[in-house]
């Protein structure tokens, strides 16, 4: 099992949840919605050879933290206390562990209080932090501490649960206009933890729901990555050509079940991924989805001759 680098993409509905395996070391990145907790628990039960090294909670949106809150609130006996939890502002997440075993957000102690009371180690993750886990290197690209400090308690309304069946038509004839974001008006996503994981000569970039403007400030020149988890489920507002021109990569992950209310993934984002791969000199672009129905809804138009786009459905990627 030496030099293995594997990414498991859990079915987190509108959210994100990843298990990253580097040889016998395992890492959780986000926990999706509450329904994902049972999959995280099952992994800990069944993969006793894989040692959980750390848990990263990228930000406080429900579709990223729900499963983590439930995991620690209801199944904490399966989570080793040796694995630190990296999270900014855990005091803003409240959970209740009651006799019925249900976890809620509206009442109860903060997640920070629950974790500390049960002996877990909490730490912040801001720009510049570099962590080493038995040869696996994790580097935090964002958020800067000044942005993380601006985070206020603002939870997104829950999704309606309806999945779109509409065709996603991607036009590769022109570069879509760049997104225009206001960090102060989207501080929850602006404060998302973006990080890289390096192991066995491979590097993966996880962009969470980060804003391109924030990550751009931490990337100098062009950097090569073996795979990139695209920000905010493929939203057109969170991926820019300016950022992609600094990210030398043609292998991408998009985590979403394609909710009707958000329209993820957006055609503009897919076009940017394809066109940036062409600019970097690749002959193909690989985009992996964790829901097959989303993958099957995409139609690529006006693709340059000789260039190939591989739309892949998979729940596991091995680098």
Explain the meaning of each model-derived region.
Residues 14, 34-35, 60-66, 92-95, ...:
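Active-site environment of divalent metal-dependent phosphoester hydrolases
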Residues 37-86, 220-237, 246-253:
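Active-site metal-binding motif and surrounding structural segment of the metallo-beta-lactamase
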Residues 19, 65-69, 96-98, 216-219, ...:
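A short acidic (Asp/Glu
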Residues 206-271:
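Extended hydrophobic/aromatic segments used for targeting, binding, or gating
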Residues 2-5, 213, 220-222, 246, ...:
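C-terminal regulatory/interaction regions
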Residues 38-42, 68-71, 101-114, 266-274:
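Well-ordered, non-membrane alpha-helical segments in soluble/globular domains
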Residues 2-48, 187-211:
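Conserved beta-strand hairpin/beta-sheet module of binuclear metal-dependent hydrolase folds
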Residues 74-203, 283-291, 295, 299-319:
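Flexible, acidic/histidine-containing loops and adjacent segments that form or flank the divalent-metal
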């Amino acid at each position: 099992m030496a030099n293995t680098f594997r990414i498991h993409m859990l079915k987190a509905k509108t959210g994100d949840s990843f298990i990253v395996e580097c040889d016998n070391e395992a890492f959780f990145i986000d926990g999706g919605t509450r329904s994902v907790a049972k999959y995280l628990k099952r992994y800990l039960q069944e993969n006793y050879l894989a040692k959980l090294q750390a848990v990263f909670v990228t930000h406080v949106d429900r579709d990223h933290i729900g499963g983590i809150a439930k995991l620690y609130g209801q199944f904490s006996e399966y989570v080793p206390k040796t694995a630190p939890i990296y999270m900014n502002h855990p005091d803003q997440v409240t959970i209740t562990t009651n006799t019925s075993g249900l976890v809620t957000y509206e009442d109860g102690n903060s997640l920070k209080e629950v974790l500390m009371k049960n002996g877990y180690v909490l730490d912040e993750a801001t720009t510049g932090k570099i962590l080493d886990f038995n040869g696996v290197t994790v580097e935090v690209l964002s958020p800067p501490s000044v942005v993380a400090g601006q985070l206020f308690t603002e939870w997104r309304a829950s999704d309606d649960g309806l999945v779109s069946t509409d065709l996603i038509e991607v036009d590769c004839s022109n570069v879509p206009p760049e997104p225009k974001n206001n960090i102060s008006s989207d501080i929850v996503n602006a404060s998302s933890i973006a990080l890289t994981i390096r192991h066995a000569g491979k590097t993966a970039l996880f962009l969470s729901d980060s804003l391109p403007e924030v990550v751009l400030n931490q990337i100098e020149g062009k950097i090569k990555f073996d795979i990139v988890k695209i920000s905010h489920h493929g939203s057109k507002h969170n991926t820019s050509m300016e950022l992609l021109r600094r990210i030398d990569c043609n292998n991408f992950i998009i985590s979403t079940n394609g909710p009707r209310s958000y329209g993820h993934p957006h055609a503009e984002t897919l076009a940017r991924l394809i066109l940036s791969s062409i600019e970097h000199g690749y002959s193909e672009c690989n985009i992996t989805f964790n829901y097959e129905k989303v993958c099957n809804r995409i139609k690529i138009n006006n693709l340059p001759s000789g260039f190939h786009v591989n739309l892949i459905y998979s729940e596991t990627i091995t680098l």
